[in-house]
Amino acid sequence: MSITAGMVKELRERTGSGMMECKKALTETGGDLEAAVELMRKQGLAKADKKSGRTAAEGRICARVSEDGKAAAIVEVNCETDFVAKGDDFVKFADDVAAVALASSAMTVEELLAGEMRAGATVDQVRREMIAKIGENINVRRFERLSSQDGRIASYLHGTRIGVLVELVGGDAELGKDIAMHIAASKPLCCDEKGVPAEVIAKEKEIFSAQAQASGKPANIVEKMVEGRIGKFLGEITLVGQPFVKDPDQTVGKLLQSKGASVVRFVRFEVGEGIEKEETNFAEEVMAQVRAS
């Protein structure tokens, strides 16, 4: 069977591979398009596995909220370079992962990867195809899904690198967005004092006590100094204690109280946080992309 230019074009569109690779696959499969796709997927998986150990610390945060605002999902999908993170293929893949995360009942990344992204292909299979096509390691690092019976889920994305989900009871959509925006900017550790681990407070109290005692002041004064510093510390790390970014004269707690609302929980993702990125200069990064193409 002769291999036509149209067949090669269609295979290129479906696989994102080069013209010669597509023509070779079609020749090897006797012009069977589906068999050629399968062959190239197998070849792509082999290439993908070689790249799967490389550090992927760039990427984007994507979020999806249900139409009724009762559920939402947020995901972090990583790649190796900012260049790839801005590409249409990667953007679509990351957004599709968020859609799968919202629709599925997956509890772990492994379960999410095993979920169906399109007919006949799991998230992980599509991920591996992306690796073969783009030439960089791609990793679905983490996700969270929130649902609310009594309130709503608000979301906020600061560009593509920071994302927040907030479960809010009371208030309106605008308040939810404002609170999510505040969390993106101020990075609170938890909602309120109840969420601060006891060991964290104990450690800070020990440090503040040592500092206060070094002042040589009486014990009762030292105790008040420590209490004051602990209060300030809690105000800095808890959502309700922080000055609201759009109106620093009031705390987030006071704002919520004035609106008759409360925050049940929140999730904040930032691209690459906690990942040790390999140092690569610009020239080396360009050369790496050229070699992979």
Curated annotation (Swiss-Prot):
Organism: Methylococcus capsulatus (strain ATCC 33009 / NCIMB 11132 / Bath)
Protein name according to UniProt: Elongation factor Ts
Gene: tsf
Subcellular locations according to the entry: Cytoplasm
UniProt xrefs under InterPro entries: EF-Ts_dimer_sf, Transl_elong_EFTs/EF1B, Transl_elong_EFTs/EF1B_dimer, Transl_elong_Ts_CS, UBA-like_sf
GO cellular component term, pick one: cytoplasm
A GO molecular-function descriptor: translation elongation factor activity
Keywords: Cytoplasm, Elongation factor, Protein biosynthesis
Residue ranges, annotated region (Involved in Mg(2+) ion dislocation from EF-Tu): 81-84
Keyword Protein biosynthesis appears in the UniProt entry: yes
Function (record text): Associates with the EF-Tu.GDP complex and induces the exchange of GDP to GTP. It remains bound to the aminoacyl-tRNA.EF-Tu.GTP complex up to the GTP hydrolysis stage on the ribosome.
Family: Belongs to the EF-Ts family.
Main location: cytoplasm
